[in-house]
């Protein structure tokens, strides 16, 4: 079975992390998010994946230099201009004349993909959509269905309290070639807002399957941190990261590292290879990337430090992300979903709450912050 993963968006809501690393390659508990998706697809019988690329495509080819991940064969479809979700699917499936699975490149889920395919077959569907239930659907597209799962409407971002259902499009599809044929080539088209709604106006067989499987969109700082917490708490099953071993209940480590005898580490947590934890440091519900440092007296609470990141003496990171090679200076505090990009620095004694901190560079950074996403979904 073949699959397409949509990984071309710019990930604007996770800037400045995504200035240097595409969102699907950001780590979730010390493993690239996309690797977790590919592992899930392979587990359900997918043997070939087309990565639909737009933003920073070279990063993906560098990450998978031999075009393989385990037993999966990877192919790359690089757009020269944004084509939207449906346009990207059409472009990525050139030369494919069989059923494909499609998933968004920012969704972590335990969906039983085999069950979705069986649902699709049982109903003789042209397209089947995975639906997940949320408490407040006002930020999503909701999909009311008949009892057998036949889709009756698409309602985009309904006002609070008036949504016809709380079941939303969860971003995983099974599509037959007839659906791909409905998408015009080389045009910017949204499958959620154009292709699927248009199918309801024509003779078609469009269905949706509800599931209570774990599901999260990692596209905001809050959800990115939530995904780390959930993986640490074994929502995916098994160890939280490749090669991890349990040092004490809920505290995992990788490789060789140094933890001072006076340091305090509270589960759930994972410390990467080469990490250093100093005297009097405290780590609670957090992840340390490879080669990262939490210095003497520093506190890391419900936060993530990417590879080579550093908290200097008595620094604090609370509900925040310290990017690759970034530094929280001595006595400084990063809190309330502060995001520090690769190589960024928070000066000694400084305070940052809900901030976006990028490595110092020319004024282009401020211009980039104001530029909206184009084409691919974020």
Regions picked out by a protein language model, each given a short descriptive name:
Residues 35, 86, 90, 280, ...:
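Glycine-rich phosphate-binding loop at the start of an alpha helix
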Residues 123-133:
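A short, conserved acidic/glycine-rich loop-to-beta-strand motif
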Residues 187, 201-295, 299:
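Extended, small-residue-rich solenoid/repeat segments and analogous flexible loops
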Residues 100-101, 108, 114-121, 134-137, ...:
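Catalytic-core segments of class I nucleotidyltransferases/pyrophosphorylases
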């Amino acid at each position: 079975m073949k699959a397409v993963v949509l990984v071309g968006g710019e990930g604007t809501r996770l800037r400045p992390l995504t200035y240097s690393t595409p969102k699907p390659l950001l780590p979730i508990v010390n493993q690239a998010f996309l690797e977790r998706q590919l592992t899930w697809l392979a587990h359900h019988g997918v043997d070939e994946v087309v990565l639909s690329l737009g933003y920073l495509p070279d990063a993906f080819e560098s990450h998978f230099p031999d075009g393989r991940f385990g037993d999966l064969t990877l192919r790359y479809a690089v757009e020269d201009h944004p084509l939207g979700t449906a346009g990207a699917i059409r472009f990525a499936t050139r030369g494919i004349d069989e059923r494909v699975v499609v998933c968004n490149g920012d969704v972590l889920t335990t969906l039983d993909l085999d069950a979705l395919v069986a649902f699709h077959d049982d109903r003789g569907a042209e397209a089947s959509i995975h639906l997940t239930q949320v408490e407040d659907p006002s930020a999503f597209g909701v999909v009311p269905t008949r009892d057998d799962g036949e889709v009756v409407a698409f309602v985009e971002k309904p006002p609070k309290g008036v949504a016809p259902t709380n079941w939303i499009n969860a971003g995983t599809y099974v599509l037959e070639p007839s659906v791909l044929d409905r998408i015009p080539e080389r045009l910017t088209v949204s499958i959620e807002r154009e292709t699927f709604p248009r199918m309801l106006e024509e003779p078609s067989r469009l269905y949706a399957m509800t599931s209570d499987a774990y599901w999260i969109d990692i596209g905001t700082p809050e959800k990115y941190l939530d995904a780390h917490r959930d993986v640490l708490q074994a929502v995916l099953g098994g160890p939280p990261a490749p090669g991890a071993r349990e040092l004490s209940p809920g505290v995992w480590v990788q490789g060789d590292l140094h933890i001072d005898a006076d340091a305090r580490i509270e589960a759930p947590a994972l410390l990467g290879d080469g990490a250093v934890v100093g005297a009097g440091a405290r780590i609670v519900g957090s992840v340390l990337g490879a080669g990262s440092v939490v210095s003497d007296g520093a506190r890391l609470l419900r936060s993530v430090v990417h590879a080579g990141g550093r908290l200097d003496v008595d620094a604090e990171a609370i509900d925040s992300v310290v990017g690759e090679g970034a530094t929280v200076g001595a006595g400084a505090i990063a809190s309330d979903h502060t995001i520090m990009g690769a190589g960024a620095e928070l000066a000694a004694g400084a305070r940052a709450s809900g901030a976006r901190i990028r490595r110092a560079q020319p004024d282009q950074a401020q211009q980039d912050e104001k530029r909206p996403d184009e084409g691919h979904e974020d």
